[in-house]
Amino acid sequence: VITVIEPEAFAPVGRLGEWLFAEGVTLRMVRPWSGDAIPDFSEIGSGLVVLGGAMSAHDDADHPWLADLRGLLRRIVDERVPAVAICLGAQVAAEALGGDTACPSPHGPEGGVVELELTEAAGQDAVFSDIVDEAVRAAVRAGIPTRDGTRLPVIVSHDDGVVRLPEGTTLLASSPGSPVQAWRAGKLLALQHHPESTPARIEYWRARSAARALGVVEGEEAAEALPDADLPQEAVAAGARARVEAEKVEPVLQAFGRALARTLVRNARAYRTAAATTR
């Protein structure tokens, strides 16, 4: 069993769930947005995924479950449980472990397709390197430049960002608009980008970010819920452009996501086996 925490309805597990199912695991879905409590560590199973959301990592007043999530993430890292934390999840993980998240990021928002700039550590990392290798191979097959395996296109959509990593963590990737894009703490892999997302989903997010920038709506959470009929044409066009850019790099996006699912499941099974032998 792998537990998936989905903070909001507009940032679903998407095709990452399909890829995890394809690896033969059972997913336990936890949805704070519908009233689910953050589970106790003993209920997690063999792995954890924490997804994104429009709320900030500091928004305990409106989302009191964030405090319980921080506590769970600390325990996950201490016990070396395989985990993936995405966007908001990565920001909450940084806060939980002693780092800092800026809301909003001093580097500004990021949306659409950006290039990950992989660190030297990424190629040797015990959790990340296999994922990178598979994504780079897919890029080469599709004729997408990687600068000798040091760059990868990914989908992003965020206003906030980690500005100081916790001690003892490994920086794995940056981007021009986000110095901390990917990092690891123990068996937890934290990703600012959205490997679960699709070109259609980034079209949805980008259009609403553009509408917010145009003053149509205030606040990221309100923008996420904006109906299509209320989007100005300029915002619709921004979303369409983002979708086209994502479709161009879809082979890499899929390869990264499938490899992420496979790596998480492999590590979760190893954790379960090790835990069983020590009982």
Residue ranges and their predicted role:
Residues 3, 28-30, 49, 84, ...:
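Hydrophobic/aromatic beta-strand patches that form the interior of the parallel beta-sheet core
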Residues 1-81, 217-279:
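N-terminal beta1-alpha1 cap of cysteine-dependent amidohydrolase-like domains
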Residues 168, 177-245:
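A glycine-centered loop/beta-turn motif at secondary-structure junctions
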Residues 13-15, 39, 59-61, 94-96, ...:
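Short glycine-/acidic-enriched loop or helix-start segments at secondary-structure transitions
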